[in-house]
Amino acid sequence: MSRLSIAPILFAGLMVCGIGMGCSGKKSGPEQKPVYKVTGSITVDGNIPDPPIQIECHSIDSLEDLNRTFSSAQSKKDGTFALETYKEGDGIPAGDYSLTFSWRKFDLIRRQHSDIDLLKNRYADPLKSETKFTVDEKPTDLGEIQLKTK
């Protein structure tokens, strides 16, 4: 094959790759903020929770901000957790936060958590949360968070 006959094929291949990359469905968004590790552990009535606790992190300064980051975690089998914003266990941006907790069994048939919170929604309101903390530009250990069902 001559160089002239390869050029159109090469050009067409590059165009297909470029179109595929441009139409990949990935949304562009705001720049990712720097994050800092936040870890801790959870007990419920003095015991390691099973099923795991779902943890949501709420920025106190931006509860109404539509561009805020969303950070969360799920407790592990040993009761420990690491908050995440962009990928597993990466941390959260610096700031002031409150945590909310829910404890729901996972329904394998429906492939989702049940509607019943075993903590009776006691820890569901970020404005009433007793677990508040500040993340400076360094790792933060929240220690043991003790939740109660009664």
Tell me the role of every PLM-derived stretch.
Residues S24-K150:
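Beta-strand-dominated extracellular/periplasmic modules and repeats
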Residues M15:
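Flavin (primarily FAD) cofactor-binding/catalytic cores of flavoenzymes
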Residues I19-G22:
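C-terminal motif of bacterial Sec signal peptides marking the signal peptidase cleavage site
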